[in-house]
Amino acid sequence: DINLSNALALIDKPVWVITEVRGRNKNNRTYSKSRSKNVIYPATITNVQVWRGYSHSKGDTGCPKCTVTVDIATKDDTGAEIYFDLPNELLNVTVFESKEDAEKELAYLNSNKNTMTYSEQRQREDKNNAKVFGIA
């Protein structure tokens, strides 16, 4: 049994998010400066979704997923404030409760990004996200 009050407790929770480096263009829009360099940003969870995952090999019988929308407020290279949100981020995959966990995952990703296949990455993500439900 999943206690949904735990999911509701995630709203407004401060977390740490692994994502691409962000910047602001001259039209004041936030954009991804680098698809190859990831950093850790502090964020706040604004939305929680729990759904039955999807697996290409198993159809609609994949692992359950818990995704969140996070709001990030940070500064760019010039010191100007940047605000953006990231929808559908996976808990324990790109969103972490502690900065130390995010740093460990980022170090792992940086050291293995060129050696893992797409399938291996998805399996690892499914396993880490399933820990939210206590099934991994």
Residue ranges and their predicted role:
Residues 1-11, 129:
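Mixed-charge, Lys/Arg-rich low-complexity intrinsically disordered regions
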Residues 25-53:
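Short beta-strand-centered aromatic/proline hotspots
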Residues 56-136:
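Intrinsically disordered, low-complexity, charged/polar segments
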